[in-house]
């Protein structure tokens, strides 16, 4: 693992696999609005855009985001089909954080200045790797999975939960 964050996630997987009985582990990078908390990337982007605050978008940090709605669909399918094992749940394509921020702002019709930023991390300060794209090939082998990040984001933004109260 490249960071403490990754190391503790892996330790959690090892602990789960020690469980007696069926185990399912999902690796994902999901986004969504929690109506009880403001701590999410999506909420941060929308809040900044609505308040016309400029943001930084990292051009060299790639991921394969999926909405909380799609993740729930996968979990429901895994439960109904009694699927066990370790599965990556990510969009079939990927984007960088700049593209994600820009797509959210476009999707909510809130133009705002987004600075193109290149992160420079060293091993001592590394929180997340620059490339954290997940391959969902194993998932595609057990269920229909063709979720593209931009289509999923558009659908999520069009049916989004309300924002947390102040």
Segments from the language model and where they lie:
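Residue-level signal for the nucleotide or nucleotide-sugar donor/cofactor binding architecture
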Residues: 3, 63-66, 95, 134, ...
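Active-site helix of classical SDR
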Residues: 8
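Amphipathic alpha-helical segments that line or abut small-molecule/effector binding pockets
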Residues: 69-77, 154
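A hydrophobic C-terminal alpha-helical subdomain
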Residues: 121-142, 146
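Amphipathic terminal alpha-helices
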Residues: 148-166
